[in-house]
Design a protein with these regions (language model features):
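Glycine-rich NAD(P)-binding loop of the Rossmann-fold in SDR/ketoreductase-type enzymes
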Residues: 152-160, 203, 207-208, 266
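Mid/C-terminal beta-alpha module of Rossmann-like enzyme folds, strongest
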Residues: 274-334
Length: 336
């Protein structure tokens, strides 16, 4: 396929942003990171295609506004300001969503809560309409983790998440958003994940997310709406995980295998807009927010190398090349 791509520096983006509109702007596709400067590759020229949203089930949420005893604050146009608690201060996703929502201070009041100590247990959740849980451990080098470290993944990704959801429900929070992950499908053979794909985590990291995913869904009822988000690899300025590592490798490796795969990705501001939509519409259900277009890993690596001015030789994906890539620390090998 021929890519109609425009290299766009994230540090200078934003000229197209329409603060007062609720629609989701252009689908962003790919990432080329050059040290502190991240570049985004657009699929289309207009950058106005809608983000592909595929809910696992039809969200059947009531649009009725419920009155909270200690919250009667309204914005100038009569819309009641929602109070949102982000549990997991300092996270990349949490801070990005917080910054996005703060563009509309008349509609959202946002607090963050550090979950690394036990003080969160005494925090009053009853003052909030929405709790958005982003605390968790990610980016595991699954091949080099001790048994004790694995237990820590379950304590944080499973136990902490479920206990937070239970507290939110017990104290009258109307909606709980949980950041699960596409990693719950890591053991599936399907190349493209759909609403019919049954989760099958491949390792302890994916399983820790899947355990929480199921238990939190079970808490949902008419008074407690639960949104489970299973995003793919998230990218953007300052992102962590696979793609900054991949960008670094693309500027150093002399060769890279030609692989015929398709990977879904999600630009951080598209995720932030999606979270805003979930809150505004008081949704409930399981969702897979992702860019509409899938990307081929080899094509992405070539683009990154080109941006960096690095000569990268693409070679057929023979057995020895794939085995070599699999030995790369972290999760980069999975991308091939």
């Amino acid at each position: 396929a021929v890519f109609l791509a425009v290299i766009h520096h994230i540090l200078h983006k934003g000229e197209d942003r329409e603060k007062k509109k609720g629609n989701i702007p252009g689908v962003l596709f790919g990432l080329a990171t050059v040290t502190e400067l991240a570049a985004t590759i657009y699929v289309n020229k207009k950058r106005k295609e809608q983000l592909a949203l595929e809910p696992e089930q039809t969200a059947q949420s009531s649009r009725k506004k419920k009155t909270i005893a200690n919250d009667t604050e309204e914005s100038e146009n009569g819309r009641r300001k929602k109070k949102i608690l982000i549990t997991g201060s300092g996270s990349y996703v949490g801070t990005s969503v917080e910054a996005w929502l703060k563009q509309w201070p008349e509609y959202y009041q946002i607090d963050t809560l550090d979950m690394r100590t036990q003080t969160w247990r005494t925090h009053d959740f009853s003052a909030y309409d929405v709790v958005y849980h982003v605390a968790g451990i990610a980016h595991a080098d699954v091949g080099q983790v001790s048994e004790e470290e694995k237990k820590q993944y379950y304590r944080v990704n499973t136990d902490l998440a479920v206990e937070t959801a239970e507290k939110a429900k017990r104290e009258g929070v109307q909606q709980f958003l949980f950041m699960s992950s596409m990693i719950v499908y890591s053991g599936c053979k399907e190349k493209k994940i759909t609403k019919n794909t049954i989760p099958k985590p491949l390792n302890f990291y994916g399983d820790s997310k899947w355990q929480a995913d199921q238990k939190i869904q079970a808490l949902a009822d008419e008074r407690f709406k639960v949104v489970v988000l299973r995003p793919p690899m998230i990218y953007g300025k300052g992102s962590k995980g696979n793609y900054p590592q991949l960008a670094k490798l693309a500027g150093k490796l002399p060769l890279f295998p030609i692989v015929h795969n398709q990977r879904s990705m999600l630009y951080i501001e598209n995720l932030a807009q999606f979270v805003k939509r979930m809150i505004d519409n008081e949704e409930t259900g399981v969702f897979f927010p992702q860019n509409e277009q899938y990307i081929n890993t080899s094509d992405l690596v070539q683009m990154i190398a080109m941006v960096k001015g690095h000569r990268l030789v693409m070679v057929p994906a023979t057995g020895w090349v794939i085995r070599l890539m699999k030995k790369i620390p972290g999760k980069i090998g999975i991308l091939t």
